[in-house]
């Protein structure tokens, strides 16, 4: 029976500082490291054997993946990295303190950007965009698909084809798959898996650094889900 494990990265240093992060490539905080280590120990205690891992190109997700596999004695497992699992791109908000953003744009507007399904924040300015376009992580990426800002809906549009083409194929082969990613890229997957409404998915909370297990039928219908 296929098993899917979703894990949101542990707390990042920008999470701890209340900054919009998005595609900014920041490290885990000490708390985030400990969350990931604890989760890896839980995987080991439950005897969960992972066959393949999918993660993003961002350090906080990659390091979370490392701790999960290291603590469960599974560092040999293949890891596939893709930009399609990156966090939602927060555009011009990236790097801003959330309280400062509320003062600048108004609390209602910031709430709409954060918690609506199909409204994206302001785009990056040209200098910010160039810094991402020139990042080696994205040198293979067609500039025409490189986001300047994303809503949750936009994030889903890039995540679900990757699910259909790559991740789901491993599950259909009966594999146990770990997806170590971000709050919004995982929300996109959960919306698709559970057919969650546009209104409900924006308020869906996913614990940081905690494995969420999906037991699936052979045709990938959800039987059960639970946190370790």
UniProtKB/Swiss-Prot annotation:
Enzyme Commission number(s) of this protein = 5.4.2.11
Residues the UniProt record annotates as site (Transition state stabilizer): 182
Signal peptide range equals none
Output the Gene Ontology terms for molecular function. Answer: phosphoglycerate mutase activity
What is the active site of this protein?
A: 9, 87
Q: Name one Pfam family in it.
A: His_Phos_1
Superkingdom per UniProt: Bacteria
Protein keywords: Gluconeogenesis, Glycolysis, Isomerase
Q: SUPFAM superfamilies of this UniProt entry? A: Phosphoglycerate mutase-like
Q: Does this entry carry the keyword Isomerase?
A: yes
Which residues hold substrate? 8-15, 21-22, 60, 87-90, 98, 114-115, 183-184
**Protein name (record):** 2,3-bisphosphoglycerate-dependent phosphoglycerate mutase
Its gene is gpmA
